[in-house]
Amino acid sequence: MMNRYICIHGHFYQPPRENPWLEEVELQDSAHPYHDWNERIAAECYAPNAASRILGSGKKVSRMVNNYASMSFNFGPTLLSWMERHAPEDYQNILAADKESQARFSSHGAAIAQVYNHMIMPLANARDERTQVLWGIRDFEHRFGRKPEGMWLAETAVNTRTLEILAEHGIGFTILAPHQAARVRKIGEEKWTPVKDAGVDPQMAYVCPLPSGKKIHLFFYDGPIAREVAFADLLESGVNFANRLLGVFPRDQHHPRLVHIATDGETYGHHHSFGDMALSYCLHHIASQNLAQVTIYGEYLEKFPATHEVQIAENTSWSCAHGVERWRSDCGCKIGGHRGWHQKWRAPLRQALDWLRDTLAPFYEEHMRAFAADPWAVRDSYIEVILDRDTQNVENFFKQNCRAELKAEEKVKVLRLLELQRHAMLMYTSCGWFFDEISGIEGVQILQYAGRVLQLAQELFGEDFEGHFKKILEAAPSNIADLCNGAAVYEKFVVPARTDLTGVGAHYAVSAMFDDHTGGKKVYCYTVREQVYDLKQTDGRTFVIGRLYVRSDITWEEGSVDFVVVPGEGQHLSAAVRASMSEEDFRDVHQEMEKVFTSGDVREIDRLTERHFGATQYALKYLFRDEQKRIFDEVIHSAMEEFEEHFREIYEHYYPLLQAKEELHIALPKALNTCIEFILNRDLLDLLAKEQTDIGALKRIAVEVKRWAFEIDKTRISFVAMQRIIFLMRSLEKDPRDLRRMESIDDILRATAPLNLDLDLWRAQRSYLAIARQVFDGSLPTPEPRWLELFRKLGDHLHVHSEQSEHSERSV
């Protein structure tokens, strides 16, 4: 019987990045060329791990495998929620992998659950810990269609109370770092053996007896190998990775042994480029050579029940040498890179959030008891609404959790109370403390969640809690002199992000001027309908006045908003917005302002605007981030076209100088070089974006760029070229007989070769292999020799080699 077992666990997680008021991730410039970091990491890691390439002869792709089906993994619930909306194909591949793994691992699934929003459990109160576990379990059941056997703890942070809560809710096991074991003993023996600095023996399962009489199984991963995977170069070779795992099995092995590691899942592709391929080849090499049995924790436990007991080291984690201090003190653990920076801000940040949570808890209880006997049980059940905000599902939630039929305003209040509690847990997401500076993107994110809590608290309870909250944050020093402290960070990054029905109405009012508005639309998690929208234009000036109905799809809050957009300085527009006035007042204001605008009296328009709507502001400031970027791009588009026209004249006029530059070895003036590079970049992007690419022009420009060493925007051009090739390959997959499309793909690949673009074409390669399978299994009629010749050439340029495509050629 095989006694050598290997399990690789990936903890796939990103902190929630959604704007708390909009429930969507806004544009993040640092993730360029992607929209945001979720999108970028999904492209680099989550997606390719579902179709990871295994290389054959000539270092060409021979097949692709779903890594998730052969490893143990967990995904953060908030990340899966984002993927379900924005990367549905990749999301479905993850769910499918869990089902596939059940056939492979004795009906045990590869996926395990995670505490809901990555809260450091030992630092949470028991009530939040319980909700985190309940929400994590229910989210898992909703997505994977089964109960989870195990659960991942954020940062593997643990104490006995946390384990008790896991066991209470049916969780069978969790995974910890080796230094988190305190002492062990063989089942049936009385004497405990302390675990020394070297750590616990990681090659077996342990059972942890709990004070309540319950128990939970614990796996302690191999620390040295995990560190080499995460922080060294072990992923440069799948064979080396496999050999490193195999190398720690005892030579004289008579009993089953489990070699297993746990790392951030993002290690496989995001932190280490093409790390997914090292993982897939490692697993393939081990299985195909019968070097060990690849398994997962649930299967291993069933086959080999624990023979030893363990007690944990209390309040420890995998990423802090000081226990869990990284998330509440200046313990010295940090990312580094900023010499002299401290983390003295961590303690006051946690103190501020703890104060906010504990201060608002009695208010929540008092107000929720008007609708339900157990306010905290209602919060536990709220995950059903978070998972499905369909109106009927929310109505069912009210019926199941509230005492009586609720009025419309009562439903709004219940939802607001529960949203306050949801954000009061989101604000404890661990990443807010993990990094070096409170004003970093992660610190700002949890402060924004706190900002949403404060806004809801003021609206619900009529009290201002913000002042004292900021007072505590004043004791959280920033490392950046201009930001001073946490209170200043809050004022700079949180307060401007806050919005409400009026803010959403202002966004719509301005954005509608740049759209073909159709009477209303969705604005993130709000529904907007036009009640009045009157646009007037005269002598190049624009005036809009209107009324909008705005409704939150989250809290069901609704109301009307009045707005006006008027000419500002220069070509700018100014806008003002307010809660709706009476019908009669609005009608009078509408008529008065329209009359004055028609007369051309700009000063009077400004006076009336301030009188009836309040102070105006530059219209684009009312827009949310993505719409600001879109409209700004539209506004400057005409200017860019004008630049292009002038630059193109220069480019064409001085083109002969390029030949002289080469023959005489003379450098072009920098200004002329800039003009030429601008045109070459524009032409490359335009050619690659067109449905029918002019291959001749593409070849000519690529040759010019290489010949004369012009600089191109390789990141952007690579991204556009990659998207174009993937699109064409997917189209070809739907209609493999389309020779012209196949030729077009091959032509683009050959034409862009001189540019040395960074093309990660795994999606195109997957389509190629799918077409090859159609030929191999006979679902595609035997192709003509010309098709096979071109298909083989395309495979060469895509660096794909498959038995299916070879077999297809031999069968003709």
What are these regions (language model features)?
Residues M2-G56, T78, W192-F514, D539, ...:
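Active-site and substrate-binding clefts of carbohydrate-active enzymes
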Residues Y5-G10, Q14-R127, T131-Q132, K147-L153, ...:
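Short, well-structured secondary-structure segments
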Residues H118, P148-V158, D264-Y268, S439-V444:
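Conserved short loop/turn motifs at secondary-structure junctions
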Residues A124, A182-K191, E228, A306:
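Short, charged, surface-exposed secondary-structure boundary motifs
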Residues Y651-V812:
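Extended alpha-helical scaffold segments
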